[in-house]
Amino acid sequence: LHKEYRRQRQMCIRDSSVTVLEAASHIGGRCVTDNSIFDIPFDLGGSWLHSADINPLARIAEQKNFKLHKKNWSNTWVHSNGVSLTSEQIREYVQYIEKMWQNINNSDASKKDLSVEKLLPKSKWKGIAKNQIALMLAADPEVSSALDVFHFTNSKGDWLVENGLGAFIKHLFNDIGVVTDCPATTIDYSSNGVKVETPEGIINSKYAVLTVSTGVLANEKIKFFPELPIRKKEAINNLPIGLLNKIGFEFDLSWQEAHQGQTADYLVGERDFCSIEFGFYDSNIAVGFVGGRFAEELEIDGLGSATNFCCDALKAIFGNKIVKFINKTTETAWKSNTNSYGSYSYALPGGFEAREILAETLNDRLFFAGEATMSNSQATVHGAFLSGIKVAEKILAIDTAN
């Protein structure tokens, strides 16, 4: 796949003039590394090489000798509604989570597309464990398609890239020019070629590849001429943009009570939930995660709300003294970001087939790519990468035929 990627890229660069428009002020969109917050780089968006065994980006990172952190993560602490679980209870909790995902992943694809919620096994651990789903899907289980999860091609390994995944992606494509702060506002594909209007002027092209989030499409930030077909609009509505926000903590180096691979889960009520992973990049950085409706509520409450909730988790587990060891914090607010309106897509129950519809080309010149168009690697950076290769192959085939 790496060789095929290089071949397709060389052909595109050799035979075509490519202009990349980026609405944000940085390269990478939802995959961006910030070097200004902590002493080490911090990924504000995508940070994982998921399913590393079969992830083409993981192979490229290995071939380019990037340092990779491959340690598995596991629960060391769980605090639920004022009670810290014992080691035996944590073992049962982890076993339930494994069974929960097995139930979803083993669901019969021929059956009606149910919500993830309806496939959760009964257990005393269901109440807390189901909150893990929003951290994976960026949406709560009752609004998420079980078939969408069923079709995801999962494999071993969730790796981190030293100095950030966003920085790695930027390095990978550093020879391709990108115009930042340049959102597309209108796309006219009514005649031969495509006309794209931006604040910087009009670009006329033979083909256009649209990689914006389903949040941008649903909010009609881009006007299309002709309008998108009803079939395409329905697909967009069946693939809402979900929300996963990250809360970063930089601890004083003297604090040594947690290390890489350890995770703490914290629940208040039924769904006020966060999970904190320690020792990112084998450093003094920890990252808290909040997802789904609860993440939206925290974001609406304002900057600092998610950080405060994760601080409550840290104090519940390690005691109030931990606060004095926190040097710096940061938190993301992807729902408020009008370049995405969220983190990544999820499918509504009954909406799994929308991914293939979203990926359909219009008039052999307007192409759709991005994680939301992938039926087996959705919601991932490598899914977005693979979607780009698929579209490049489509363009080359059409161009050759013409």
Model-derived features with residue positions:
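A short, Lys/Arg-enriched amphipathic alpha-helix followed by its capping loop at the start of a domain
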Residues: 10, 14-16, 175-176
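Conserved flavin/dinucleotide-binding core of flavoenzymes
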Residues: 142-150, 193-195, 204, 221, ...
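Glycine-rich FAD pyrophosphate-binding loop
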Residues: 14-37
